[in-house]
Curated annotation (Swiss-Prot):
Keyword Zinc: no
Keywords: mRNA capping, mRNA processing, mRNA splicing, Nucleus, RNA-mediated gene silencing
PANTHER family: CAP BINDING PROTEIN, NUCLEAR CAP-BINDING PROTEIN SUBUNIT 1
Bilayer-spanning residue ranges: none
Protein name, UniProt field: Nuclear cap-binding protein subunit 1
Species the sequence originates in: Aedes aegypti (Yellowfever mosquito)
Compositional bias (Basic and acidic residues): 702-716
One Pfam short name: MIF4G_like
Residue span of region Disordered: 667-716
């Protein structure tokens, strides 16, 4: 054998492979370059947008032969992921269609497929942006007006279906209405009568629909000075105003107008007949919302005028700002910079628009899209980027919110207090407190003094107590929180007369000497049980409150130095907690002692109860019962108590979600392994002459497959655990709502008997908390709506209470 020849052959082989790699690499580079060019079009450039578009279209046309599918995919994704550049991409597609009719047809088919897939997969925003883009292609002479009108008519038909949720019907009308600012003028000029018929059908629909959900979504309970309109009503008013103006708007950039002479010569495509997919029970539709208004033109200084509430420009500006927040909410600096760099920023009072939109997001009911701190951090970045204007606008907004706080929704009150305390902590807690001192003359339960008190309590979590003495005017002394110190009764004056004092002191010594949990139980065993009042009691008491009192208060007082010390103490003596807290009554007793010790430190209470839930020392139902107990009456309107209740509900919800996911994964693995075993047995029993499974092929099977394979018995046990968790979750909600009904009914009956007005501050706080539970946990509560309706929210309870439940059920009806 000629070795030289062999090496030469090898050289040819490796050379060929190298050329292939180089060719693949070049293709990848070209694809990435094309993608970058398409994504970046319309961004800062030294040349005009029109010349950029012409150049890019020429590049894309020359590369269609090699990268057709890639170009189709990118061009169909961009207007959905970057809806603010919709008209730029429609112009680009229009120019390509004018040069290459076949490509235009392929693109329309691709876009229609994207639209239909978005509807099937319940990606409602993507579907709406796809519909908008298809509509804008009419302006670029890519799609015919007749076929678009047919699509819009089909969507209105979907809105008039019977026996489907109203939220589905609402979305289809919203999608059509929100598209009209882009294509309304074109339809008006070419198909005026068809457009009018479409609008008449929409008006009939809007006049018939119910709005029971409206009140539960309002930020304020009154409409002065700004009405709080339901989103479809507001958009309809804006579209009617646009129609009065002959569909002429001043906000949407329309680069295709510069190419009208080219585009008008292009052949158009007809959309295929598109029918929205039928409703399925698994479909989740967007919930309704109320359009938030904080400012009007009188609030803004001299300069650009804020568009009116019913001008389409207001809708377009707000939608653009919302989409920027959605795109950049993970990075606050980028988000703030992009908000301040909005197109047409010189034609509007931008700072006022931004602040209004951010508070609209923060106060969105039933829950904001993102964490409260997300909006707070964006506002701080905005103040840093624009220190000459933004802090003043934000201060003005805060003043407006405080003045209107009397009628503010309870959930929004909490978010406002959380945001304001966080904001103050980033600006050295400076504020013109003297401007608000008139609130000191009001009742303590009134929202204004209550707001300041809650803000200071939240600030205390972010600072230290002495800071408040220096920071706050003396007139506010009654609202300043007490020092956050434990109240340990066994060292206070008069402690000698308490029955557990001697044992408490022994326990302190024992714990400091690093005793075991068994030693602690031994110290506690001789304490008398105050529940056994007589020697003749035949039934032994299920728990000893004195043991719990002495142990819990002593241990937590010793761990009071920090959260870490407290957690370490709870972990070390977990056995003692579990031994003493065998019943729900005993667990409530533990919670009572946590409250008694830490009554002046709300954050410590929240953190300890969270730890007790995580370590399963107390059950969620015990916390719910304790929150509504008589000893907590004085705390009932304080925010921290509801923080505890909501974290308890979330713990239960997370537990159910975790078990549900584990069961789903186990079933999937079981099915997968069953299929794998079946195919293996088929291969092993293959007839002679066919490929059998060799030992080498068997070895390629992942090692973990059999190890992770669950048995049917394990899956059954997991199903039982999940079923038990659902029962616990339902019981938790039943306890909470039953207690709400009891205390509210008692208040209403008492006021009626005494001839007093029931609408007190306490009543409004309590109804607000009931609404808050429904709203914050709407996804979980809706599963038990029928149970709640049949057992608790029956027709015989007071209409004021029943109305809250009906508003909740209307959210997804």
């Amino acid at each position: 054998m000629n070795r030289r020849r062999a090496y030469e052959d090898d050289g040819d082989f490796y050379g060929e492979r190298s050329r292939k790699r180089r060719r693949v690499s070049e293709n990848q580079e070209m694809e990435e370059r094309l993608e970058t060019l398409i994504l970046r079009v319309g961004e800062n450039s030294s040349s005009s947008l029109e010349s950029n578009l012409e150049g890019l279209v020429s590049v894309l046309e020359s590369d269609l032969g090699n990268f057709r599918s890639k170009i189709l995919r990118i061009l169909s994704e961009c207007p959905i992921k970057m809806p603010e550049k919709c008209t730029i991409y429609s112009t680009m597609v229009g120019l390509m269609n004018a040069k290459n009719y076949n490509f235009g047809g392929e693109f329309v088919d691709h876009m229609v497929k994207t639209f239909k897939e978005s509807l099937k997969q319940c990606r409602w925003d993507a579907a709406r942006y796809a519909l908008r883009f298809l509509s804008d292609l009419v302006n670029c002479h890519v799609i015919s007006t007749n076929s678009l009108l047919q699509l819009l008519d089909n969507m209105v038909d979907a809105a008039n279906e019977d026996s489907v949720p109203q939220v589905r019907r609402d979305w289809y009308v919203f999608a059509v209405l929100s598209t009209l600012p882009w294509v309304g003028r074109e339809l008006y000029e070419k198909k005026e009568s068809a457009l009018e018929n479409l609008l008449v059908r929409i008006e009939v629909f809007l006049n018939k629909r119910t709005k029971k959900h409206h009140n539960s979504l309002r930020v304020w309970s009154v409409d002065a000075p700004h009405p709080q309109e339901e989103y479809l009503d507001c958009l309809w008013a804006q579209i009617r105003k646009l129609r009065q103006d002959n569909w002429a708007e001043k906000h949407i950039p329309r680069p295709y107008l510069a190419f009208d002479s080219v585009l008008c010569e292009a052949l158009q495509h007809n959309l295929p007949l598109i029918h929205p997919p039928p409703h399925q029970d698994s479909f989740e539709y967007p919930m309704p919302w109320v359009v938030y208004r904080m400012f009007d033109y009188t609030d803004c200084p001299a300069g650009p005028i804020l568009p009116g509430a019913h001008s389409i420009e207001r809708f377009l500006i707000e939608e653009h700002l919302h989409s920027i927040i959605e795109a950049h909410h993970w990075e606050r600096k980028d988000c703030a910079a992009n908000l301040l760099n909005l197109s047409y920023k010189d034609k509007i009072p931008l700072e006022y628009c931004i602040v209004e939109v951010i508070f609209a997001e923060l106060f969105k009911m039933p829950t904001p899209r993102y964490l409260d701190i997300c909006y707070g951090s964006i506002l701080i970045e905005l103040c840093k980027l624009q220190p000459s204007k933004m802090p003043q606008v934000l201060a003005q907004a805060t003043e407006i919110l405080f003045m209107r706080i009397d009628s503010m929704n309870t959930s929004c009150f909490d978010r406002f207090a959380n945001w304001f305390s966080y904001h103050l902590s980033n600006f050295q807690f400076r504020w013109s407190w003297d401007d608000w001192d008139s609130c000191l003359l009001l009742e303590p339960e009134h929202p204004r003094p209550k707001f300041i008190e809650e803000v200071l309590l939240k600030c205390l979590r972010l600072s230290y107590h002495d800071r408040f003495k220096e920071m706050m005017p003396e007139t506010y002394s009654k609202l300043i929180p007490k020092p956050p110190m434990p109240t340990y009764k066994y060292t206070m004056e008069g402690a000698a007369s308490l029955p557990g004092t001697a044992t408490a002191h022994k326990l302190v010594v024992a714990i400091r000497q690093k005793c075991t949990p068994e030693d602690v139980l031994n110290e506690l065993k001789d304490l008398p049980n105050p529940r056994e009042t007589s020697e003749n009691d035949m039934v032994e008491s299920t728990f000893n409150p004195l043991k719990i009192d002495v142990f819990v208060q002593t241990l937590l007082n010793l761990g009071s130095k920090s959260f870490s010390h407290t957690f370490a103490a709870i972990s070390k003596f977990h056995l003692v907690f579990k031994t003493l807290a065998e019943t729900e009554e005993a667990q409530i007793c533990i919670l009572h002692n946590v409250f008694e010790l830490w009554v002046n430190h709300q954050q410590m209470m929240v953190v300890i109860i969270d730890k007790l839930l995580k370590t399963q020392i107390v059950e969620c139902s015990a916390v719910a019962t304790w929150v509504f107990s008589k000893e907590m009456v004085g705390e009932f309107t304080k925010m921290y108590l509801w923080e505890i209740l909501h974290l308890t509900i979330k713990k239960m919800n997370q537990h159910v979600t975790k078990l549900s996911k584990e069961l789903s994964d186990a079933k999937e693995r079981l099915d997968r392994n069953a299929e794998s075993s079946s195919s293996e047995s088929e291969e092993e029993t293959a007839p002679a002459g066919t490929d059998a499974v060799t030992p080498q092929r068997r070895r390629k099977k992942p090692i973990g497959d059999n190890a992770d394979k669950p048995t049917e018995e394990q899956v059954e046990r997991m199903e039982e655990k999940l079923e038990a968790a659902y029962v616990d979750q339902k019981r938790l909600f039943l306890i909470i709502f039953q207690r709400f009904i009891m205390i509210l009914s008692e208040h209403l009956v008492k006021c009626d008997t005494d001839g007093r007005d029931y609408d007190t501050d306490w009543y409004r706080w309590t109804v607000g908390r009931l609404q808050q539970v429904f709203m914050m946990h709407h996804e979980q509560v809706k599963k038990y709506s029928s149970t709640l309706e049949s057992l608790l929210f029956t027709s015989d309870i007071d209409p004021h209470i029943l109305d809250v439940f009906h508003q909740f059920t209307a959210l997804r009806s």
